[in-house]
Curated annotation (Swiss-Prot):
Residues 1-21 have a biased composition (Basic residues). Cell wall formation. Catalyzes the transfer of a GlcNAc subunit on undecaprenyl-pyrophosphoryl-MurNAc-pentapeptide (lipid intermediate I) to form undecaprenyl-pyrophosphoryl-MurNAc-(pentapeptide)GlcNAc (lipid intermediate II). It is a peripheral membrane protein. This is UDP-N-acetylglucosamine--N-acetylmuramyl-(pentapeptide) pyrophosphoryl-undecaprenol N-acetylglucosamine transferase. Its main location: membrane. InterPro entries: GlcNAc_MurG (IPR006009), Glyco_trans_28_C (IPR007235), GlycoTrans_28_N (IPR004276). The keyword Cell division applies. UDP-N-acetyl-alpha-D-glucosamine binds at T58, G59, G60, N170, R206, S234, I288, Q333. It comes from Acidovorax ebreus (strain TPSY) (Diaphorobacter sp. (strain TPSY)). Residues 1-30 are annotated as: Disordered. It is found in: Cell inner membrane. GO terms for cellular component: plasma membrane. GO terms for biological process: carbohydrate metabolic process; cell division; cell wall organization; lipid glycosylation; peptidoglycan biosynthetic process; regulation of cell shape. Keywords: Cell cycle, Cell division, Cell inner membrane, Cell membrane, Cell shape, Cell wall biogenesis/degradation, Glycosyltransferase, Membrane, Peptidoglycan synthesis, Transferase.
């Protein structure tokens, strides 16, 4: 389980100043979130509004999309979700009550020449499928949050002259959002200076992350062993699962942190064996239902550096050691982590440098006052109104 600096606008060739100004207007407001949304709602016709959300592949795309979908539903919107069959989004979205619209499309990166040569035909077919969905639903807005499914869906939206809103979660833009950003009605980013002519709003997230007490209130008066939360994410992190039990075994039992370790569903049994072999007690779980509360409870979080993890850690205000996934596209997890690390809001350890002995020494040298300082610095970088701002823009565009 997770952004800030000022952003700048970069003019694009062929786009008029008036068009650029048109994009920038709208979501910025001097009114509180509820006031903005209430005003929008009162001025809208009584008809039901429809949004088509497009996001897939990983939890980093899907969970921000779910936060937006739930906020729109609370405002009376009908929300549909464009995704691919057999995917993570198909497992996560329908149980939350959103209609799932499947199309056949997947990525080509690293899948060989044959897959690359078949791309034009596959993309054309996916665009036709997405176009049929858009024609049937006639959505008031289409929202893309990344993953390959966003590209054919975004093309279909623009061909149908539907407003297209994009949100990029990472500090390095994904291919689909990068290509579509020139066609979009609005572009939003979780980190600053990611895409030209985009508005930096942070990541959509559940309210629980923004409502946790400040670090100085949560951590005041704590004594005893440190509380360590290890987060592998929705797919788990094998390197953390292997090294953390060994590191804890290096620490004398009376000095060990109290550990909660989230592994991912596929790795929970292997993790249990690793802790048993190390002779270390810990609370092991494949999934954490309330990540916000878990971040707030921990003195220290050891985790990957996906966009959602980094921005959620900033929202809560938690001290973290980030171990970026080394095979992430364009090494975007390192860039994500640096957003907090460079202001003193956490530590960055590359996976190649992570050893059991080194981690044990790091944990033994940590003091609560240092962790509090890191948590406070992380919280200064939080940007928590993405859901409000994007929903408000949807309501304006749907008038």
């Amino acid at each position: 389980m997770t952004s800030r600096f000022g952003h700048s606008h970069h003019p694009r060739r062929g786009r008029s100043a008036r068009a650029r100004a048109g994009r920038r207007e709208g979501v910025q407001s001097n009114f509180p979130a509820t006031q903005v949304l209430e005003r929008s709602a009162h001025s809208l016709p009584a008809r039901e509004r429809t949004a088509l959300v497009m996001a897939g592949g990983t939890g980093g795309h899907i969970f921000p999309g779910l936060a937006l979908a739930e906020a729109l539903r609370e405002r009376g919107w009908q929300v549909h979700w464009l995704g691919t069959p057999g995917s993570m989004e198909e497992r996560l979205v329908p149980p939350r009550g959103f209609a799932f619209e499947p199309i056949d499309f997947s990525g080509v990166r690293g899948k060989g020449l044959k897959t690359l040569l078949a791309l034009p035909l596959r993309l054309a077919r996916a665009c036709l499928q997405a176009r049929a969905v858009v024609r049937r639903l006639q959505p008031d807005v289409v929202i893309g949050l990344g993953g390959y499914v966003t590209f054919p869906g975004g093309i279909a939206a623009r061909l149908a002259r539907k407003p297209l809103l994009l949100h990029e979660q990472n500090s390095v833009p994904g291919m689909a959002n990068k290509l579509l950003s020139r066609l979009a009605t609005r572009v939003y980013t979780a980190f600053p200076n990611v895409l030209p002519d985009a508005q930096w709003v942070g990541n959509p997230m559940r309210r629980a992350f923004t409502r946790q007490p400040r670090p100085e209130r949560r951590l005041a008066g704590r004594e005893g062993p440190l509380r360590l939360l290890v987060v592998g994410g929705s797919l788990g992190a094998k390197a953390l699962n292997d090294i953390v039990p060994q590191a804890l075994a290096w620490i004398h039992e009376q000095d060990r942190p109290i550990v909660t370790h989230q592994s991912g569903e596929s790795q929970i049994e292997a993790l249990r064996r690793s802790y048993a072999a190390a002779g270390v007690e810990a609370t092991l779980t494949p999934f954490i239902e309330d990540t916000a509360a878990a971040f707030a409870e921990a003195d220290l979080v050891l985790c990957r550096a996906g966009a959602s993890t980094v921005t959620e850690i900033a929202a809560v205000g938690a001290a973290a050691v980030f171990v970026p996934f080394p095979h992430a596209v364009d090494d975007h997890q390192t860039t994500n982590a640096q957003y907090l690390v460079k202001v003193g809001g956490g530590w960055l350890v590359q996976q190649a440098d992570l050893t059991a002995h080194g981690l044990a020494e790091m944990l033994q040298n940590m003091k609560r006052q240092d962790l509090l300082a890191k948590a406070q610095k992380a919280r200064t970088m939080r940007k928590i109104n993405a859901t409000r701002d994007i929903v408000a823009a949807c309501e304006r565009l749907a008038r």
